[in-house]
Amino acid sequence: TGVQTCALPISVDATVGIAPKRARGFVNAILRKVASADVEWPSDAVRLSYPDWLVTQLVNDHGETDALAMLERMNVEPSVHERVDGYVQDPASQWVCEMVDAQPTELILDSCAAPGGKATLMAAHGAIVVAADRSTKRTRLVAANAQRTGATSVSAVVAEGTASPFRNKAFDRVLVDAPCSGLGVLRRRADARWRIDAEAIERLTKLQTKLLAHGAQAVKPGGRLVYSVCTVTRAETCEIAATIGEGFESIDVLAMNDVWRPWGSGGGYVLPQDQDSDGMAVFAWQRVG
């Protein structure tokens, strides 16, 4: 990689510098020979520095070519994208808000809102946003970001997404940006690859299913429901979307923005190597009943 290419000469020079003067030529020759030799890695997981299970998971879900390209890209430092209001937000998160398509004066529920990036962006379109999250600490973060960006129509509310205090069919649009394995944002959280495990995905899918079901109850007839996660495992995307109950018709997200690859019934996903963005998946429905 570029990082390795840069680091090797530095490492060689540093080592030569501490060697006895009479041995420096010998040390330099040996180290540079080793540095230029082809390395036979025991596996892609070792080569790219990821847990075995994670590499296997993504290869199973996306095929070897896309999975390895994704893993390689997430070892590269991400670009910084700043909105006009000064908030730094990855393009994929902004594309999710495009799927919500919040309109002026509409009442929007962002049911897993912290840190508030999506809520403030939807408010910038003139919508009234109820930004809910499960703890005071998290809603304070939302409120602080709303104040910093001038998003005066955002109301931060402590509310558990699986036991919603809101009336059924109360909102024009609902965004369920659910907690997930975060495998699409590992370029921002490099250590997270070693903290998550396969069992965590199974636990998260149970939570995601409940969050989507409760979010669906809050949508008005004719309103829109959007489910998004910053991961691209099938278990947390297509399989969760398939649990949506009767009364909802799928909206083709690819027709709204062609950055997405097709995923399941009407959904879409983007991999980090596609658009220099985080990995993200999104599904959208209209309530017809």
Where are the model-predicted features located?
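S-adenosylmethionine
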Residues: 4-289
